[in-house]
Amino acid sequence: MARTDLFRFLARCARTAAHCERTGMPESEAVEASRESIADRTGRRRLLQGAAGAAALAAFGAHAGKSQAQGPADVAVVGAGFAGLYAATVLAGKKLTAQVYEAGSRSGGRVASLRGVFPGQTVERGAELIDTTHSTVRQLSRQFGLTLENYEKQPGEEFFYFSGRHWSEAEVVAEYRAFVGAMNDDLQRLSGGPTADSHNAFDRELDLMPLSTYLDSRGAGPLLRRVMDTAYTIEFGREIDRQSSLALLFFAQANKRAHFAPFGNFSDERFHIVEGNDAIAGGLEGQLARAVAFGHRLVRVSRTADGRIKLAFDVGGRTVETVHAAAILTLPAPMMREIDFDASVALPAHSRTAIDGLDYGTNSKMMIGFTGRPWFERLGCNGGSYSDLPNHQNTWETAPSTAAFGVRGVITDYSGGNRGARLDPAKLQTEAGAFLQDLETVWPGTTALASRDSQGRVLAHLENWVRNPLFKGAYTNNQPGYFTGLEGHYAKPAGERLFFAGEHTDSFYNYQGFMEGALLSGARAADQAWRALR
């Protein structure tokens, strides 16, 4: 499971390298065999994951259809993203009424679909890719009658451009194969998934070691070093000197992260909702017994004398206070640091540590429209490209099922780290031009077909979540020290009848950073609130 194509590619490299080690098969043959095996697994996985999703929804008490209001709201849910909406849904299934508050003017949070900009196609400003193992997302898409398109079924190959030239997948696998051998001693000494509450001294040592230092100290080859740099920078949104080496090691050791198993049942499939991923948010919002209270920015949390939770909101410049039996806060991690937690809350040390310490990546997305699909029509590429160029890191084709050869197509330019942070939506044409110039190096002869208006302006949209005042970041980055200092803390109750949810509160070993993680964290927090109030 991964947010980006390049991370999926590394997973495939890991699996292929392991197969070469076991069998002695040449890298080029193993690469071809790996590609052929992907299609064979699709139907069986889809059936199994659909059943798993239904079971998860039933276990958390989720329901279909509009819930009925039952007097005053028992639980406040702050944030109308996936976590908050699903928490309210699960609470309704447990016969608890929730009031959802949202600082912005819409539901969905960082799941935000863009319609009407690219003719005939819906693209994603934020979360886009849905994995086979994202059972809850897929079950909800079925519940709301939405259509999943499979990006992996698109024809063509991926392009890799590093150190001034194109490379084959087999060449990357060869260097990865050598590097995996160098990691074996470290993998043997790591514990079974370290957390802030349970880890050994070696876990701590490698957790504090930046990924950049680890790659250099373990002798990563020059090509692999550049590929890893790009892959992890865009996957977690920070430069690799700001990431823990354990993020790599638990990627490589499949049994440490059961849903992300490059040597076993890792999924190479990725899906998108044709109608737009935020249609799930619309479906969940439509089921709520109480309308979402938009324009409510949480500024302070305190307790009343009888132990209830008092929330103070800024609503158009005036303060509005509400009191609830319990509260679930689902704000993005950077926004949690702006809340004033009164001493009466008695916030536990683990909660304060999580709030103060968790880091977010600086990812951006820029979508570019084309008059056709020249990456395939001219070069045989499926839309996936990766490089170490200054204005290009990773691309994929967005909404391919609604594209048309010779007519229309959309490429997503996905970035992280320093480039992701600096991209400026106010300078859209400048940013698009710089990207297209580097893309021409990766895909020669294709960028002339970028869609332009009569004045030569490129059809494009740029989203930088760091610059959005309601989010101030993309999603969780596992910085040095995260695993042994923070992992597991955010999911714990924040004192009596106060709980946290959101992708950042889910475990790294589950679905942290994904829509699935947001949904499951909402279900977990709702269950915690229900148990506290029953």
Feature map (PLM): residue ranges:
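Glycine-rich FAD pyrophosphate-binding loop
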Residues: 92-114
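Dinucleotide-binding Rossmann-like beta1-alpha1 core, especially the glycine-rich loop
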Residues: 118-189
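Conserved flavin/dinucleotide-binding core of flavoenzymes
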Residues: 5, 12-22, 308, 314, ...
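Active-site/ligand-binding neighborhood in enzyme catalytic cores
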Residues: 30, 195-300, 307, 315, ...
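Mid-domain catalytic core of redox enzymes
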Residues: 294-414, 442
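N-terminal secretory signal peptides
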Residues: 1-42
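N-terminal Rossmann-like FAD-binding beta1-loop-alpha1 element of flavoenzymes
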Residues: 74-99
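N-terminal export signals
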Residues: 39-41, 46-67
